[in-house]
Amino acid sequence: MDQKLENILNLALETPEEEREQTESLNVGYSAESRSWELIVKYHGSLDGLREQNIVVEELIAGYAILTVPETLVDTVSETPEIEYVEKPKRFYYQQTDPDGASCFPPVTRRTPFLNGRGVLLAVLDSGITWDLEVFRKADGSTRIRYLWDQTIPWDQTIPGKQAASREQETLRNPTLPQNQIMPEETGDTGYGRTPDGFPIGTEYTEEEINRALNSSVLERYGLIPSRDLTGHGTAVAGIAAGRSADGLYTGAAPEAELIIVKLGLPREEGFPRTTEIMRGVTYALRKARQLNMPLVINLSFGNSYGSHDGSSLLERFLDNASEIGRTVICVGSGNEGAARGHFAGNITRDGRVELAVGNYERNLNIQLWKNYSDVFRIRLQAPGGEEAELSTNIQGGKYTLELEQTRILVYLGEPLPYAVAQEIYLDMIPAEGSYINAGIWTIRLEPVVTVTGQYYLYLPAGSGIGESTGFYRATPQVTLPIPSTAAKVITVGAYDPVYDTYADFSGRGYADSTRTIGVAA
């Protein structure tokens, strides 16, 4: 086990590719075509030595970088003295966004103190935007979008009139397409867009280019700027944050703010963005705010349940650092996990039995158990048919495999790491036979051996990644904030139900000890 690498990355590297492909999370960040990993690192000094070894380096802010590393060189990265810690990307899921008049925007935007966002940059990192809507325009019809960076549209040398793509962009482009293939809607030399400075992917469109496109016919616009919000999620988020109708009947929180839009993600089968793409988007927004000399608000409406939820991951620390640069505020949604049955918390002196319902047709499922390193538990896992096995928790780190009924279980026991305060025991369930893991009630029994705090937390993947029938019995609604809303220096925004005048039941919740709380409920 390499203690510079996070636990789930160690497990991924120790697991054969054919098994990783069966899991929900272990293969995220790996390109089978180029046989390379995309990795997030915390570093100091210079990374020029890695560049000389065919490793692509994207420096971000505050000593963070994204590396694209041939799998044979991952050990080289870990052994580099300048590298402090390494994580793999995580897949992020959309968080619910329902606008509601109960948020009371109009009273503060239309009269004293006129908090309408004028003179402020609002960066929305999401699924894109329907950029020609009137709600994102000024009174004269011109756009309020200063920059639109679509990470999914490659800037390619095969299109006449366009500059050659960099080596980094060639490495990072969509691995599912041949290197010289461009999607039909991206072909043609329009004279619009370019790869943004300092980034190897995507196409950036300026305010001037968007206005030129707006002055063309409706049919021509998306031929000039082919960026589309296919899900509508990003458009809804931007509308809540900064929308404004021409008649003034609809207004968002900051109807006069200027916008930076980042459509996240390289085109890929699962369609969800990764940690790395969010970090690129945050860095891009910070650089634009510095260039324009404007205060910046960044909105993130994505979340993931993987992690100890204590602010210690590289993404959480990255956002804490980003919030200290210039005049920057970062707002993150509290997610939809409050009522999703994806979390169970207990104390070994009181709760020794955890029951998990697994619905039909689950192709894989992972379970995280987080506890104090000083606590020692005896853990037994029982399958729906009654077959039972004890987990060997006395192994010092590393992976092993066991089988219960028709389900193979990859077990990883974490060791102390520089950026991990709690110990992780990670279980990844994949089919041993057939296409699905065993449905029914799985039981986890915990027995104390050495107790210091006795506290433990269990997490499943975010609700968007599992079936509705899968979840813990007696689930715990507390500590269901998704990462990165658990970062210490972001504003976490919860959901409020005006019909019942209460906190929305689906909205993620924080810790009962009040050290980490929801900043706003709207």
Across the structure, where does each feature detected by a protein language model lie?
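Autoinhibitory N-terminal propeptides
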Residues: M1-I66, T72-T112, R118-L121, D140-G141, ...
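Short acidic, glycine-rich surface-loop motifs adjacent to enzyme active sites
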Residues: V262-L264, V282-D310, G333-S334, R445-V449
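Subtilisin-like serine protease catalytic core
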Residues: R110-D156, E168, E185-T276, N293, ...
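Short, aromatic- and glycine-rich surface loops/edge beta-strands on solvent-exposed regions
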Residues: V77, I367-Q368, A439-P448
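Edge beta-strands of jelly-roll/beta-sandwich modules across compartments, strongly enriched
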Residues: T451-A462
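Intrinsically disordered, low-complexity segments used as extracellular stalks/linkers
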Residues: Q157, G161-Q163, R167-Q169, R173-P175, ...
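Extracellular S/T/G-rich loop segment that most often corresponds to the catalytic His/Ser-adjacent loop
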Residues: Q151-P154, E185-N215, A340-Y426, I430-G434, ...
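Catalytic cores of secreted or luminal carbohydrate-active enzymes
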Residues: V297-I298, L315-A345
